[in-house]
Amino acid sequence: MNGEEQYYAATQLYKDPCAFQRGPVPEFSANPPACLYMGRQPPPPPPPQFAGALGTLEQGSPPDISPYEVPPLAEDPAVAHLHHHLPAQLGLAHPPSGPFPNGTEPGGLEEPSRGQLPFPWMKSTKAHAWKGQWAGGAYAVEPEENKRTRTAYTRAQLLELEKEFLFNKYISRPRRVELAVMLNLTERHIKIWFQNRRMKWKKEEDKKRSSGTASGGVGGDEPEQDSAVTSGEELLALPPPPPPGGAVPPGVPAAAREGRLPPGLSASPQPSSIAPRRPQEPR
């Protein structure tokens, strides 16, 4: 046991060369001890039978570093060899690609064709129709679906339609079919024409009714003025009230006594009826 303790003590002293320079009580010092800057003593050479094994181990061992140096990070050749041969060992046909296929960038992706619209009803909307009118329009719109043309009626067609509307404001289905065949029109055209014509007729009737009401209101005020004037004239033409004794002059007619004379007649007796007639002189 004593031999082993001496052996371990000797090895500790060999590994720590500063042990010979340290005192019994450690003292605080801001500077590191000088023994750290001293080179390490080389170990004794190993036996020849272990020289080959130690040589291979020293190739992968980290280099000798000082306490104030940071060792550079180097890639292990075995790990690098494993990284290079990993896809081949796993049997991958293609290496892992990025988020964009075939090396394309976000700006290089082709936009979907705008000329081919997925639904037919999208071509008849106004948003695509007006764009199709221009030469550089990106929307392929058929000419007949671009804009609905307005139906132009001839004079003969309008004459027949007006005659029919004069007799019937609302046309029946059999008569509409007959007119469509006779005028070379569709039933839809005739139906829409009658709807528009009825709206126009109703507006004209409302305008006539409003103008007649306005003229009737203006003419209704005039008779009231005339009646007021005539009533004043009648009051002026009435005879004076009878005397308090109740005696009425003999020339006043009975209608004037009762106050029922017309406005053109006066209550006073005419002088021709009161004055005596003169006898005619012989010639």
From Swiss-Prot:
Residues 13-73 are annotated as: Transactivation domain. It is found in: Nucleus; Cytoplasm, Cytosol. The keyword Transcription applies. Residues 146-205 bind DNA. The modification Phosphoserine is found at S268. A motif (Nuclear localization signal) lies at residues 197-203. Residues 36-66, 201-283 are annotated as: Disordered. Pancreas; islet beta-cells. Keywords: Activator, Cytoplasm, DNA-binding, Homeobox, Nucleus, Phosphoprotein, Transcription, Transcription regulation. Residues 238-252 have a biased composition (Pro residues). The keyword Transcription regulation applies. The modification Phosphothreonine is found at T151. GO terms for molecular function: DNA-binding transcription factor activity, RNA polymerase II-specific; RNA polymerase II cis-regulatory region sequence-specific DNA binding. Phosphorylated by the SAPK2 pathway at high intracellular glucose concentration. Phosphorylated by HIPK2 on Ser-268 upon glucose accumulation. This phosphorylation mediates subnuclear localization shifting. Phosphorylation by PASK may lead to translocation into the cytosol. One of its GO terms (cellular component) is cytosol. Its main location: nucleus. The Antp-type hexapeptide mediates heterodimerization with PBX on a regulatory element of the somatostatin promoter. The homeodomain, which contains the nuclear localization signal, not only mediates DNA-binding, but also acts as a protein-protein interaction domain for TCF3(E47), NEUROD1 and HMG-I(Y). Activates insulin and somatostatin gene transcription. Key regulator of islet peptide hormone expression but also responsible for the development of the pancreas, most probably by determining maturation and differentiation of common pancreatic precursor cells in the developing gut. As part of a PDX1:PBX1b:MEIS2b complex in pancreatic acinar cells is involved in the transcriptional activation of the ELA1 enhancer; the complex binds to the enhancer B element and cooperates with the transcription factor 1 complex (PTF1) bound to the enhancer A element. Binds the DNA sequence 5'-CC[CT]TAATGGG-3'. Interacts with the basic helix-loop-helix domains of TCF3(E47) and NEUROD1 and with HMG-I(Y). Interacts with SPOP and the methyltransferase SETD7. Part of a PDX1:PBX1b:MEIS2b complex. Belongs to the Antp homeobox family. IPF1/XlHbox-8 subfamily. PANTHER family: PANCREAS_DUODENUM HOMEOBOX PROTEIN 1 (PTHR45664:SF12), PROTEIN ZERKNUELLT 1-RELATED (PTHR45664). This is Pancreas/duodenum homeobox protein 1. It comes from Mesocricetus auratus. The gene is PDX1.
